[in-house]
Amino acid sequence: MAKPKTPEEKNYKVIAENRRARREYAIEEDLEVGIVLEGSEVKSLREGGSNIAESYATVDDGELWLVNSYIAPYAQAKTWKHEERRRRKLLVSRRELSRLWNATQRQGMTLVPLVMYFNHRGLVKLKIGVAKGKKLADKRQTDAKRDWNRQKQRLLKQNL
């Protein structure tokens, strides 16, 4: 029997990453969800034309939606062009949907997309995080910790 792959061995191609989310929000948990796309959107993603930095996820009428994400138009699509900033449905189980909805009902919580990628089967997946906005002091603390860790690594390298 084959042993399961570790996270380092999993092969996936990152399409878009929301780097600002880790700085602006305190991520409590993350979840991998599927996304409903049109054919021209998938082809455009394979070319690398997307941005999820300004987008967010929301629960409407018992469904999870990705709002304000940008997927560039596909140049070869003539008649079936997609809308660049349309709402895209996210695929998630009912149990996870109710858990996410309950999480967003708490004060200051939101759903933020972290990474969009092709998984090992070639399907587009989105990792969303349940997040709470950071205050300015929290951001400074995070920066100070990161700087201190860099300094420690430099000192360890010099001593070796």
Curated annotation (Swiss-Prot):
The keyword DNA-binding appears for this protein: no
Keyword list, A-Z: Cytoplasm, RNA-binding
Transmembrane segments annotated in the record for this chain: none
A single BP term in Gene Ontology: trans-translation
Compartment(s) where it occurs, according to its Swiss-Prot or TrEMBL record: Cytoplasm
Gene Ontology molecular functions: RNA binding
Chief place of localization: cytoplasm
InterPro entries hit by this protein: SmpB, SsrA-bd_prot
GO cellular component, as recorded: cytosol
Role description: Required for rescue of stalled ribosomes mediated by trans-translation. Binds to transfer-messenger RNA (tmRNA), required for stable association of tmRNA with ribosomes. tmRNA and SmpB together mimic tRNA shape, replacing the anticodon stem-loop with SmpB. tmRNA is encoded by the ssrA gene; the 2 termini fold to resemble tRNA(Ala) and it encodes a 'tag peptide', a short internal open reading frame. During trans-translation Ala-aminoacylated tmRNA acts like a tRNA, entering the A-site of stalled ribosomes, displacing the stalled mRNA.
Family membership noted in the UniProt record: Belongs to the SmpB family.
Protein name: SsrA-binding protein
Organism from which the protein derives: Dinoroseobacter shibae (strain DSM 16493 / NCIMB 14021 / DFL 12)
Source organism phylogeny: Bacteria, Pseudomonadati, Pseudomonadota, Alphaproteobacteria, Rhodobacterales
